[in-house]
Structure formats: C-alpha cells, structure tokens
Regions:
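Conserved N-terminal segment of class I S-adenosyl-L-methionine
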Residues: 1-86, 92-96, 106-109, 200-210, ...
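A short glycine-rich, Lys/Arg-flanked "PGG" loop and its adjoining helix->strand segment in the class I
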Residues: 106-121
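Alpha/beta-hydrolase-fold catalytic nucleophile elbow
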Residues: 125-127, 175
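A SAM-dependent methyltransferase catalytic signature shared across enzymes that methylate proteins
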Residues: 156-173
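Conserved catalytic loop of SAM-dependent methyltransferase domains
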Residues: 171-210, 229-231
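A short hydrophobic/small-residue beta-strand
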Residues: 41, 122-123
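Short, glycine-/aromatic-enriched active-site segment of Class I SAM-dependent methyltransferases
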Residues: 127-151, 159-160
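A short His-aromatic
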Residues: 97-101
Length: 246
C-alpha cells in the first residue's frame, strides 16, 4: 500500500489517537493508512457513493484486526467549501489531490485552516507543474471532463495561497516519478483508450514495482522525483498564535 501513498505519514508525524481529517478522501488510500496507524480518522468527500466503499473497507479492517483496538474511522459526505466540523477540531488535515479540482480553492484552504487546531499540521498534495503541463498539452480530455483539473499550480502559487490562508510551509516532497510517463502515454493515446498496448505494458511495470519494490526502480524514482514526480506534497503547520498578514 505504501507504494501508492503520496503522503509520508512518518514525516507528517502521525501518532495513535490523533484526530485526523482526510479532506477529499476519494477511494480512501490515505484514510486506510491513517486508520492502520491508530489515528481517529474522518474520511470526508463529496461523493457519498465512494464513501460507502470506504466505510465498507473500514469495517473489514476492523474485523481483520488491521487497526489498533479503540481506534475510530468514520466517513462524512459534504462540501469542502463548507465542512460540517467545529473550529479547531483536528490535530492534522490531509488534502491529497483535491485543490486542483476546486474552482474556489482558496475558500477550501481557509476551511482546512478553520478546522485545524493551532499548532496542528497539514499536508496538501497536487499534481506537479511540469508533468501536469505535459498531460494538458497532450490531451484536452485529461483535464476538461466534468470534475477534472481546473488549474496547474506552480509550487510558489500553491504555497502562497496556503500561506494566505494561515499556514506556514515547512518542507515539500515530490513523489511518483515513475507514474508520470504512464500518464503521458495515456494522454498521447487518449485517456479513455484502455486497450492500447503501450500504456497497458507500462501499467504492468508499475504494478510489478508496487508489489516487488526492487532496488533499481526505488533508486530511479528517488533520483527522478524532484524532476518529474507526478505529485508534490507540501507539509505545513498552523501557528499556535495567528500571524497577522501584511
């Protein structure tokens, strides 16, 4: 599972018992790892149907003993621009691959900050500028579909908007360099063309890498992540005292 996670929870510093929001949880990949680590996780998304699958997986994990006893995992459906949580409710917020979908991204960022405790930590991940720009150049379908990507962030723009919302960037990491060529191939042949042999072959390579984690691909990805990493993750903190902005 760790191979497909964009967030490094060791670097984020997740500890058992912390209340963590997965904002825009989607299919739940980060929420499941948070649950395994003993966090009190809330998977939040606008897609109630997808959250049903997440809730089913939470129940299966509990049944199989994959999460520490006494840990809670819940799902909540709603709007990221107006989340149904009290102020300063969460110790941490994870927002992975959500902001690029939202026309009102800055409003969502302010909501993230509102529900995060002072001194709390957050991580926001988005597609990296260069790999994403290549995808947009190769295919309109990639980003123009309903619910698709509405912008490409530069790292300075993303950190600037998050800073304006009240967060302090601490460090950043790029991830998934080996995934970028796959998406370039998909965009070149058509994102909806699932039968083309080139993307199929590359996808088999990615699955093999995920299952086997050989040193050669781990080394290659570590080398290439800063250059063509498909995603960039910005790790941030919320000051314990609000910092007035000029």
């Amino acid at each position: 599972v760790a191979a497909v996670l964009t967030v490094n929870f060791d670097e984020l510093g997740v500890r058992p018992g912390q209340r963590v929001l997965d904002m825009g949880a989607g299919a739940g990949r980060h929420a499941f790892e948070l649950y395994r680590r003993g966090a009190e996780v809330v998977a939040f998304d606008q897609d109630a149907g997808e959250l049903e699958n997440v809730a089913t997986m939470f129940a299966a994990m509990e049944h199989e003993g994959e999460a520490p006893a006494g840990t809670s995992a819940t799902t909540v459906a709603g709007d990221a621009l107006q989340m149904p949580f009290p102020d300063e409710h969460f110790d941490m917020v994870v927002a992975s691959e959500i902001m690029e979908h939202l026309p009102e991204d800055e409003k969502a960022m302010h909501e993230l900050v509102r529900v995060l405790k002072p001194g709390g930590r957050a991580v926001v991940t988005v597609p990296s500028w260069f790999p994403e720009r290549v995808c947009w150049a190769l295919s309109d379908t990639y980003h123009a579909n309903e619910g698709g990507h509405v912008r490409i962030y530069t790292i300075d723009e993303l950190e600037g908007k998050l800073g304006n919302a009240g967060l302090v960037p601490v460090f950043r990491r790029h991830a998934h360099a080996l995934h970028s060529p796959y998406w370039w191939l998909k965009c070149a042949v058509g994102p909806e063309n699932n039968d083309h042999p080139l993307p199929q072959a590359y996808h088999r390579l990615l699955v093999w890498d995920m299952m086997s984690r050989p040193w050669i691909t781990r080394f290659a990805e570590e080398l290439l992540d800063p250059v063509i990493g498909k995603s960039v993750a910005v790790y941030l903190s919320k000051p314990k005292v609000a910092v007035p902005r000029a």
